[in-house]
């Protein structure tokens, strides 16, 4: 039990970059993904109309970087602010656009991110 507490304390004390590296290593070693699974809506018979209304009221959004724009440096800076990625990871994300920046976030957070990239890069919210 004390070993678990020590492990928890060590994990909590990691920097964000170290924690991200730990997650990647665990994903590779265990063959899993830390990304949240997308919710699945199954509609059947009379419940179909209710399910369609629920789908129309989306609560989780994905912010996608569609195009880095003319000034990649400013885009990389904005990506780092929004995602807390390191410089190399942010550059790779910008160079590989279109790619998701943030997934499963609220509409307010998605709009705030879109405002941050206004005039810097092309952002799409899904």
UniProtKB/Swiss-Prot annotation:
Keywords: Ribonucleoprotein, Ribosomal protein
Pfam hit, one: Ribosomal_L12_N
Origin: domain of life: Bacteria
Keyword Cell membrane: no
A GO CC annotation given for this chain: ribosome
Record GO terms (molecular function): mRNA binding; structural constituent of ribosome
Any one GO BP annotation for this protein: translation
PANTHER family noted in UniProt: 39S RIBOSOMAL PROTEIN L12, LARGE RIBOSOMAL SUBUNIT PROTEIN BL12M
Protein role: Forms part of the ribosomal stalk which helps the ribosome interact with GTP-bound translation factors. Is thus essential for accurate translation.
Description of how the protein assembles with itself and partners: Homodimer. Part of the ribosomal stalk of the 50S ribosomal subunit. Forms a multimeric L10(L12)X complex, where L10 forms an elongated spine to which 2 to 4 L12 dimers bind in a sequential fashion. Binds GTP-bound translation factors.
Similarity comment: family membership: Belongs to the bacterial ribosomal protein bL12 family.
Protein name in UniProt: Large ribosomal subunit protein bL12
């Amino acid at each position: 039990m004390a070993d678990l507490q020590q492990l928890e304390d060590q994990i909590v004390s990691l920097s964000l970059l170290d924690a991200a590296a730990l997650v990647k290593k665990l994903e590779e070693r265990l063959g899993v993904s830390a990304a949240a699974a997308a919710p699945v809506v199954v509609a059947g018979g009379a419940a179909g109309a209710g399910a369609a209304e629920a789908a129309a009221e989306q609560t989780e959004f994905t912010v996608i970087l569609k195009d880095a724009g003319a000034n990649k440096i400013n885009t990389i800076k904005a990506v780092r602010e929004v995602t807390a990625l390191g410089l190399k990871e942010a550059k790779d994300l910008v160079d590989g656009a279109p790619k998701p920046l943030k997934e499963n976030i609220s509409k307010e957070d998605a709009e705030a991110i879109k405002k941050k990239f206004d005039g810097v890069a092309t952002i799409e919210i899904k």
